[in-house]
Amino acid sequence: MDAATLTYDTLRFAEFEDFPETSEPVWILGRKYSIFTEKDEILSDVASRLWFTYRRNFPAIGGTGPTSDTGWGCMLRCGQMIFAQALVCRHLGRDWRWTQRKRQPDSYFNVLNAFLDRKDSYYSIHQIAQMGVGEGKSIGQWYGPNTVAQVLKKLAVFDTWSSLAVHIAMDNTVVMEEIRRLCRANLPCAGAAALPTDSERHCNGFPAGAEVTNRPSAWRPLVLLIPLRLGLTDINEAYVETLKHCFMMPQSLGVIGGKPNSAHYFIGYVGEELIYLDPHTTQPAVELTDSCFIPDESFHCQHPPSRMGIGELDPSIAVGFFCKTEEDFNDWCQQVKKLSQLGGALPMFELVEQQPSHLACQDVLNLSLDSSDVERLERFFDSEDEDFEILSL
């Protein structure tokens, strides 16, 4: 439990275990590396992911609520990380790399702004926690992978700069026809009146200089999140190889999930170990200067990432993929179909062209779900919460 509530001030990065000397390839979000010849490239790739951890001394959530998420916000932070990776792929590309003390493009700061711990950032801990209240989750209550996915989907509607099509595949089924219809739709931003004013936009996820347009496009970039349960109390070994292959796909956003007492953002694997970013470090909240300069070093993991055995993974997870173009989606579909040919491996989800007749829940496609929709969906996945324990403050 102590390891789950480390503070940034006392954290010794030298204590983190380095990668093992192995001939096994290292897979990080669709990229393959050799530990012998590409160690620096591996660490650079890991350091370039946005790392969101517990924070303290941020503005009170809701004005009178918590000023720290230590002990309860780890799944929310993991949701931020997987969604931030989607925005990085959307605006910077998968091959973009962060370098300490090197000037980054404006789009990078625009993405980072969207996740700062302030009420007017689109995907802030404040927005996620308060949106969760509307879905029956009190502030400080544990979120399972499905719950945080549902909340992020609702928040994405307001992010017209990114213009993402967010689809959450329920019942372990991905329906290609529904996704194509969603991504080809040119829907106006629901709740546009709630967007920040021009004077506010330079300090949040919809900043000055970010191009926002209503011009129609053939395909809105897809964020596909698939909540899954890969066993009762432990992960079924028959899913392990399929899970590994998800990290090999170029469209991979990783996996959110974890083990009892903690949630993690899994970004790859080596051998029989998963590689993950751990949110269980408490850092001071970042304060913006008058010029809105963001001290960003604490948002990047500059030490070897954590690892855990695949068998330790709690079976409740959400797998994420990003398809910027329709060609990306078609390629992803072909790769998923090939997974069925893995000997001795079970598919984690089903890919179908049209919705099966036994699935009648059309509401999951709505960009703006009402509370009854989400409550119905969460009842199906309530079991995901029971296997996690809430960390004490």
Curated annotation (Swiss-Prot):
It holds the Pfam family ATG4_LIR. Inhibited by N-ethylmaleimide. Redox-regulated during autophagy since reducing conditions activate ATG4A whereas an oxidizing environment such as the presence of H(2)O(2) inhibits its activity. The cysteine protease activity compounds is inhibited by styrylquinoline compounds 4-28 and LV-320. It comes from the Eukaryota. Keywords: Acetylation, Autophagy, Cytoplasm, Cytoplasmic vesicle, Disulfide bond, Endoplasmic reticulum, Glycoprotein, Hydrolase, Isopeptide bond, Mitochondrion, Phosphoprotein, Protease, Protein transport, S-nitrosylation, Thiol protease, Transport, Ubl conjugation, Ubl conjugation pathway. It is found in: Cytoplasm; Cytoplasm, Cytosol; Cytoplasmic vesicle, Autophagosome; Endoplasmic reticulum. The modification S-nitrosocysteine is found at C189, C292, C301. It catalyses: [protein]-C-terminal L-amino acid-glycyl-phosphatidylethanolamide + H2O = [protein]-C-terminal L-amino acid-glycine + a 1,2-diacyl-sn-glycero-3-phosphoethanolamine; [protein]-C-terminal L-amino acid-glycyl-phosphatidylserine + H2O = [protein]-C-terminal L-amino acid-glycine + a 1,2-diacyl-sn-glycero-3-phospho-L-serine. One of its GO terms (biological process) is cellular response to starvation. Phosphorylation at Ser-383 and Ser-392 promotes autophagy by increasing protein delipidation activity without affecting proteolytic activation of ATG8 proteins. Phosphorylation at Ser-316 by ULK1 inhibits autophagy by decreasing both proteolytic activation and delipidation activities. Phosphorylation at Ser-316 is dephosphorylated by protein phosphatase 2A (PP2A). Phosphorylation at Ser-34 by AKT2 promotes its hydrolase activity, leading to increased proteolytic activation and delipidation of ATG8 family proteins. Ubiquitinated by RNF5, leading to its degradation by the proteasome. One of its GO terms (molecular function) is peptidase activity. The active site is at C74, D278, H280. Disulfide bonds join C292-C361. Disruption phenotype: Mice develop normally but are born at a slightly lower ratio than the expected Mendelian rate. Cells display systemic reduction of autophagic activity, characterized by defective proteolytic processing of ATG8 family proteins, compromising the rate of autophagosome maturation. Mice show severe balance disorders, which are caused by defects in the development of otoconia. The central nervous system (CNS) of mutant mice also displays amorphous globular bodies in the neuropil of the deep cerebellar nuclei and adjacent vestibular nuclei. Transmembrane segments: none annotated. Its EC number is 3.4.22.-. A motif (LIR) lies at residues 388-391. One of its GO terms (cellular component) is endoplasmic reticulum. InterPro entries: ATG4_LIR, Papain-like_cys_pep_sf, Peptidase_C54, Peptidase_C54_cat. Interacts with PFKP; promoting phosphorylation of ATG4B at Ser-34. Interacts with GBP7. PANTHER family: CYSTEINE PROTEASE ATG4, CYSTEINE PROTEASE ATG4B. Belongs to the peptidase C54 family. Cysteine protease that plays a key role in autophagy by mediating both proteolytic activation and delipidation of ATG8 family proteins. Required for canonical autophagy (macroautophagy), non-canonical autophagy as well as for mitophagy. The protease activity is required for proteolytic activation of ATG8 family proteins: cleaves the C-terminal amino acid of ATG8 proteins MAP1LC3A, MAP1LC3B, MAP1LC3C, GABARAPL1, GABARAPL2 and GABARAP, to reveal a C-terminal glycine. This is Cysteine protease ATG4B. The lineage of its organism: Eukaryota, Metazoa, Chordata, Craniata, Vertebrata.
